[in-house]
Amino acid sequence: MGLSIFLLLCVLGLSQAATPKIFNGTECGRNSQPWQVGLFEGTSLRCGGVLIDHRWVLTAAHCSGSRYWVRLGEHSLSQLDWTEQIRHSGFSVTHPGYLGASTSHEHDLRLLRLRLPVRVTSSVQPLPLPNDCATAGTECHVSGWGITNHPRNPFPDLLQCLNLSIVSHATCHGVYPGRITSNMVCAGGVPGQDACQGDSGGPLVCGGVLQGLVSWGSVGPCGQDGIPGVYTYICKYVDWIRMIMRNN
């Protein structure tokens, strides 16, 4: 009953915080991203996330709220899809190497353990972790409810998707000299297409596996020509992720 009441409150009133969203994407196919998570504080969307196990969600470390309402199986944020599941995050584990966005964006990932496991359905499913690292030129996509390029309605109601490709480490280092490490991967750089404010922690999916989490990018407008977004390179953290889940 408590979750049902909370869901009704969510669909009756929704606000979105100015934290990284999909810029110039298109509506995702319904149920095409069953691992997509929205992290809410009350009715305010704070970050994206990705379901990687029936009880674990992965998001960005800079999404620093202590407790979240975790919404899964969502497509529209303002209308009932009848596929939603709501969970409350229990405890979380931030990567011990993360020093904060003001110091370095490295190790920008955080695991959230759900108080109750999800029910796996066609609309709610975990996304596999990678066995290998995606290389330059790999075609991927990113999803979220972040800022769009529509001036009258910058915060989308419907889940947005965007296709983009992995950029070489050398190219990305040239754009962000001295700031890119081997634990980061860059994608995009096509004019007008990017993750943007509000998509933080959301998944970069390549070949049906999780390769990145939306982390950071240019301080200027989203979707600048030749300016890729920067993602936490999940292939570098698989052992740590599995250790945390196994021990908790």
From Swiss-Prot:
Signal peptide start-end: 1-17
GO cellular component: a single term: extracellular space
Entry annotated with the keyword DNA-binding: no
Principal location: secreted
CDD domains: Tryp_SPc
Family to which the UniProt record says this protein belongs: Belongs to the peptidase S1 family. Kallikrein subfamily.
Annotated protein name in UniProt: Kallikrein-12
Organism: Homo sapiens
